[in-house]
């Protein structure tokens, strides 16, 4: 009997143990990452040929303590390699693990290689050659602290390499993991199996091979035992012949069918080729089809199973599309696949929540470094009076109500951009803005006391409901997460897409960018203030400080201003402001753009203006500014500088976003200025619930 070890992906150990025991293994002991077992030579070949779950079959050769590189060398030499190698066999060493002595795996591999080669030369035998690409023998050494474990990898290449898959494409899951997913899905061979996002077909091919009793090792051309001195070719050929006989019989007797679809025509062609190479191409129908086109191939029965490894995404901006995909799949399952089972494998349990289905079972497994979950569902048969459940029903109802009221108002006002929802319900703590036929969801980061997974699931529900209520495609919904007004967060670069959208605001056209920054280039709550500036600006010289993207300058220019001067510290936003001005036919010397620290420029400027708009940050401590600024502390000093630039009879419109801001009326009076608060006049219906979004004042000489 040989002591052996079968490695596998974490989470599959118990499943592998059961498989090995069915093959005849004894003394099976589960450890993290695999199973120790015992078996004779025939069992070695059977496990290599028939294990659908093992990554490798390893034959341990010995262990040694490693306190120096000499210890490693001598420990390897203690093994009788001349009785392990066939004459002329090539080999390669795979070394993993480090300690205080062996600090480089390549160095460790070199010491092992030297020890093996020297074992031959000392007996005056031809030295074996190294072949790193396709060796006859693969020696594995694992160094854990001071102990090195030395073993012969009888698999050669990993057992997930079945020999049927085109290796040029991306592989989301290995064949061994795919087989485990099929086994855990609850699917019964002989019943229909469908994968609506099949990619290169791995799940379906593994299922078909299992159902037709086709050994996973049948198509492999290279093994790790070809240079092993104890290899028994007779027994191996018997195991191989038995596998071939069983495969022919299984294929001839199998009567059910498999169905695969994917939106990518190239991967479907690859899936067809893979299935043909696996010898089960006739059993699987592959189609180019989007999930939106998914339908039951057997509406009159029998019932089957839908299985898939849907995309999960790693970028925030991909989530709306993925949530919509899962939500659509859930609805399609309920509408067309009553009586069927569904099994999905995913690295995102939150996305699976968007199905709006209750799982009967779930399993955990690792897909490479990713923690994944497989959830199995039974789809109840639908009845005529069944009503589909609404995702985030309270939120959806409020959004629908707001849309009905605000859409009509916005159309009458001649605006395309407005706030549709602003944390109206505390449990749905987001803002939703419309930009033409686009929508932006801004999630306010939940407090640390809120369970992160629950908050994420709630956000996914919000996205699904928003897509449903607004009736927009997922690629026109943008998701952002922000904390409430923290310093320079609004200027944080998020992406590099550079996609701009032309929107209308009253008589102005403005560029917005919904993806690249936390803010979009247009502060919606200042909409009425901008219109007022346009109405006040005819024949006047207009100054816009802390101008952002210059939208106020556009309104002033369109209102007939004699000149506009737009000042901001950011070159990016000044270039954006210039684009906005040009979009409205405003260019030339009458429309100046100045890149400068606004506070510094204000102290040094000696020009005169009739109308000044200033919307400073609540607080700023930018490295590019000479000093810190606090709007509550410094607004009187700011007004003193502004007064110097204000012509007789001129007006300053002063706005800021500080909650609880208190205007120092006495301080202004000492400067000879009066202030009239116009905050309520500048709040539009879409911001009626948030009356502290900003405060706004008209300031004039007394």
Curated annotation (Swiss-Prot):
A cellular component annotation (GO) from this entry: cytoplasm
Keywords: Cytoplasm, Methyltransferase, RNA-binding, rRNA processing, S-adenosyl-L-methionine, Transferase
A molecular function GO annotation: rRNA (guanine-N7-)-methyltransferase activity
Signal peptide interval: none
Principal localisation: cytoplasm
Catalytic activity, EC: 2.1.1.173, 2.1.1.264
Catalytic activity reported: guanosine(2445) in 23S rRNA + S-adenosyl-L-methionine = N(2)-methylguanosine(2445) in 23S rRNA + S-adenosyl-L-homocysteine + H(+); guanosine(2069) in 23S rRNA + S-adenosyl-L-methionine = N(2)-methylguanosine(2069) in 23S rRNA + S-adenosyl-L-homocysteine + H(+)
Compartment(s) of residence: Cytoplasm
Domain THUMP, chain residue ranges per copy: 43-154
Cross-referenced InterPro entries: 23SrRNA_methyltr_KL (IPR017244), DNA_methylase_N6_adenine_CS (IPR002052), RlmKL-like_Mtase (IPR000241), RlmKL-like_Mtase_CS (IPR053943), RlmL_1st (IPR054170), SAM-dep_methyl-trfase (IPR019614), SAM-dependent_MTases_sf (IPR029063), THUMP_dom (IPR004114)
A Pfam family of this chain: THUMP
Top-level division of the source organism's lineage: Bacteria
Coiled coil ranges: none
Described purpose of this protein according to its UniProt entry: Specifically methylates the guanine in position 2445 (m2G2445) and the guanine in position 2069 (m7G2069) of 23S rRNA.
PANTHER family cross-referenced by the UniProt entry: RIBOSOMAL RNA LARGE SUBUNIT METHYLTRANSFERASE K/L, RIBOSOMAL RNA LARGE SUBUNIT METHYLTRANSFERASE K_L
NCBIfam families xref list: PRK11783.1
HAMAP family: 23SrRNA_methyltr_KL (MF_01858)
Entry's family note: Belongs to the methyltransferase superfamily. RlmKL family.
Entry protein name: Ribosomal RNA large subunit methyltransferase K/L
Organism: Salmonella gallinarum (strain 287/91 / NCTC 13346)
Gene: rlmL
């Amino acid at each position: 009997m040989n002591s052996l070890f079968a490695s596998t992906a974490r989470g599959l150990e118990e499943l592998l143990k059961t498989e090995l025991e069915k093959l005849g293994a004894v003394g099976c002991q589960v450890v993290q990452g695999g199973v120790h077992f015992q078996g004779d030579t025939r069992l070695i070949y059977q496990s290599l040929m028939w294990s659908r779950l093992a990554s490798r079959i390893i034959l341990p050769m010995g262990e040694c303590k490693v306190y120096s590189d000499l210890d490693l060398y001598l420990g390897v030499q203690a093994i009788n390699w001349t009785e392990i190698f066939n004459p002329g066999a090539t080999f390669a060493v795979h070394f993993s693990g480090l300690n205080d002595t062996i600090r480089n795996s390549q160095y460790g591999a070199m010491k092992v290689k030297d020890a093996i080669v020297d074992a031959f030369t000392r007996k005056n035998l031809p030295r074996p050659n190294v072949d790193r690409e396709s060796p006859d023998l693969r020696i594995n050494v694992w160094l854990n602290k001071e102990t090195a474990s030395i073993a012969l990898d009888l698999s050669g290449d990993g057992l997930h390499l079945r020999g049927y898959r085109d290796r040029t494409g991306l592989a989301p899951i290995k064949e061994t993991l795919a087989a485990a997913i099929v086994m855990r899905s609850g699917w019964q061979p002989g019943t229909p199996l469908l994968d609506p996002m099949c990619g290169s077909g791995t799940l379906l091919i593994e299922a078909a091979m299992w159902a037709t009793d086709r050994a996973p090792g049948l198509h492999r051309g290279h093994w790790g035992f070809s240079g092993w001195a104890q290899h028994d070719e007779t027994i191996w050929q018997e195991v191989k012949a038995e596998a071939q006989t069983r495969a022919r019989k299984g294929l001839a007797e199998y009567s059910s069918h498999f169905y695969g679809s994917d939106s990518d025509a190239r991967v479907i062609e690859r899936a067809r080729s893979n299935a043909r190479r696996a010898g089960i191409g006739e059993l699987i129908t592959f189609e180019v089809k989007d999930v939106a086109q998914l339908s039951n191939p057997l509406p009159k029965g029998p019932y089957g199973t839908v299985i898939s490894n849907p995309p999960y995404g790693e970028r925030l901006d991909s989530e709306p599309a993925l949530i919509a995909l899962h939500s659509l799949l859930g609805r399609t399952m309920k509408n067309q696949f009553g009586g069927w089972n569904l099994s999905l494998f995913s690295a995102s349990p939150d996305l699976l929540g968007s199905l709006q289905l209750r799982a009967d079972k779930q399993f955990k497994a690792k897909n490479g470094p990713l923690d994944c979950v497989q959830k199995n569902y039974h789809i109840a048969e639908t009845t005529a009076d069944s009503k589909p459940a609404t995702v985030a029903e309270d939120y959806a109802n409020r959004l629908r109500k707001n849309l009905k009221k605000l859409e009509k108002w916005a159309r009458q006002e001649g605006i395309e951009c407005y706030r549709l929802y602003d944390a109206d319900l505390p449990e749905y703590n987001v803002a939703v803005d419309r930009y033409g036929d686009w929508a932006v969801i801004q999630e306010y980061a939940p407090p640390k006391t809120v369970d992160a997974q629950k908050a994420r699931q709630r956000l996914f529900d919000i996205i699904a409901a928003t897509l449903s209520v607004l009736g927009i495609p997922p690629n026109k919904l943008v998701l952002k997460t922000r904390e409430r007004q923290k310093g320079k967060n609004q200027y944080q670069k998020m992406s590099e897409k550079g996609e701009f959208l032309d929107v209308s605001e009253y008589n102005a056209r403005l560029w917005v960018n919904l993806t690249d920054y936390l803010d979009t280039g247009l502060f919606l709550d200042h909409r009425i203030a901008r219109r007022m500036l346009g109405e006040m600006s005819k024949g006047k010289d207009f100054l816009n400080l802390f101008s952002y993207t210059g939208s106020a300058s556009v309104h002033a220019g369109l209102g007939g201003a004699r000149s506009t001067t737009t000042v901001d510290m950011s070159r990016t936003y000044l270039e954006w402001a210039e684009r906005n001005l040009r979009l409205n036919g405003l260019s030339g010397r009458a429309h100046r753009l100045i890149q400068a620290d606004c506070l510094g420029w204000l102290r040094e400027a000696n020009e005169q203006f009739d109308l000044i708009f200033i919307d400073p940050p609540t607080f700023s401590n930018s490295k590019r500014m000479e000093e810190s600024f606090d709007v509550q502390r410094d607004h009187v000093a700011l007004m003193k500088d502004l007064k110097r630039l204000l012509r007789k009879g001129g007006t300053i419109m002063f706005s800021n976003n500080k909650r609880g801001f208190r205007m120092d009326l006495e301080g202004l009076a000492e400067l000879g200025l009066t202030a009239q608060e116009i905050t309520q006049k500048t709040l539009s219906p879409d911001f009626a619930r948030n009356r502290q979004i900003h405060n706004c004042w008209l300031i004039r000489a007394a």
